[in-house]
Amino acid sequence: MRAVGLGLGALLTLGGCSTLPGASDAPQLQLAPSLLPSLSYELVPYAPEPLAPADLWERLRRGYALPELHHPRITSELNWFVRHPDYLERTFTRAEPYLHFAVTEAERRGIPLELALLPVVESAFDPFAFSPARASGLWQFMPATGRLYGLQQDWWHDERRDVLKATEAAYTFLEDMHGFFEGDWLLALAAYNSGSGNVRKAQRRNQRRGKPLDFFSLDLTRETEAYVPKLLAIARLVRDPEAYELALHPLPNAPQFAVVETGGQLDLARAADLAEVDMETLYRLNPALNRWSTHPDGPHRLLLPVDKVEAFRTGLAALDASQRVAWVRHIIREGESLSVIAARYHSSVEALRRANQLRGNIIRAGDALLVPRASATEERYALSADQRERRT
């Protein structure tokens, strides 16, 4: 647009200031009034889009929006992390597959990017973290809160550990708390940890005593009083690691996984073979999966390393439907129940009912059942719920 404007300007200048011999005697160019509006234009300054940083840490810093506060509790947490650099190194190494998505989703919602670091506090970025209070996953959802935010939990999978759904649910929860506490992110974070009712109760106590209602003035549990300062301390360390003599290993500002449709239930050992990845990688990208296959009712998708997607799709397209999940024909014996048979084959009663179109639990000796079963040995499904429980 600028080039067109300058061309018109030059044309008009030449027409009015010509120095050619006899120019004053030459006929003057007249512009019809109806053409004048079409010649009006405006020069718009060119503002190039800022280049996206190659390093995810830098992208994260650019989106900081929480207040930068100085408080003894923050200093205490800072000092602990500085004394334990190995802890942060291990945690940020675990974060690498997940952090880019967490940052991208926070950016999409327009919320402070420091919130993408909350799993450092919640789970040390361990997707299988499980607390004594039964909180689970990167974002440590309790069972009831998870259900409230649409995270399904059953025998086949626990979406509190789902990388995509749990991240989205956590941000929605935080946004809800942010609105509830009238735009105060620190109170929203406190409520994420201890519940909005407990934070509101502490505010009412302070109100009766004529005290301030901000986070650092409230009398909360010891855990919650340390929770928010921990996040603020981690954010400060990420902002300026050199000031604390810490080295953050570079994280690429690029997706670390892709979402790939499976088109139906799929044995995880088969999926790992198709994608040419080890089972631990597959489970760590899909930690919601409790068993040896994806959920029969979906979602029919897997997260895979970006460089393995093409191999997986090619292999899946050539896979016969009968190879997706292995089946065995079981003859019911006297005294057997669906629960006994399900336990034997590491399946579920619901899966047996669905596969055999049973309305109830009544079965008869001598009849045959089709039973879905794993295609590999138990040991290969190293991070299934059964295998994890045996290690604890």
Segments (PLM) and residue ranges:
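An acidic, Gly/Ser/Thr/Pro-rich helix-cap/linker signature
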Residues: C17-G110, L115
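Extracytoplasmic low-complexity/disordered linkers and repeat tracts associated with LysM-containing
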Residues: T19-P21, E223, R236-Q265, M279-T392
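Short, functionally critical alpha-helical segments immediately adjacent to catalytic or ligand/cofactor-binding
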Residues: I111-F128, A188-S194, T281-N286, L352-N356, ...
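Short alpha-helical "recognition helix" segments of helix-turn-helix
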Residues: A271-L274, I341
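Solvent-exposed, acidic/flexible segments
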Residues: F81-L99, R108-I111, S131-W139, E159-A170, ...
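Bacterial N-terminal signal peptides
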Residues: G5-G15
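Glycine-rich, acidic and aromatic/proline-enriched surface loops and short helix-turn segments
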Residues: V120-A124, L138-L151, N193-N198, A233, ...
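Substrate-binding clefts and substrate-entry loops adjacent to catalytic sites
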Residues: S76-T93, F125-P132, Q140-E168, T172-G183, ...
